[in-house]
């Protein structure tokens, strides 16, 4: 039953984003995160899709008073610094029961201009046996925030999770 709900939520998310326009607000509060283990590169490659208005509102709620204008011509000079600080506070990982840090690789705007793709990477992951995710992105902003987490680990094993303001953690054993 949970898989049916997850598939329906993903469908609504993609359908809604394909008809969005720049000036329209969105009523659904969903972010998504893909985490892929690269055995060849010994890295975790992380891709997140987050709506920009929500992201900037949550960063401001955390105490940043400057308007960031992320992924626009007027982007704040320290936009990437504020993003990394936000991600470090709201997105934590443990690999094989050890806390890991990640590098912020970059960002790009989505086709509908409402969201952004954000790229992170954890280096020196020799083997992936266990992954613990703490994902609190936007969960303090909206009670109905949903986060779809897709993980591809060793031997192409996949895991799908739906996290929200009540359930912020997921554990996967490979």
Regions found by a protein language model. Name each.
Residues 1-26:
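Bacterial Sec-dependent N-terminal signal peptides
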Residues 23-174:
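N-terminal soluble domains immediately following signal/targeting peptides that reside
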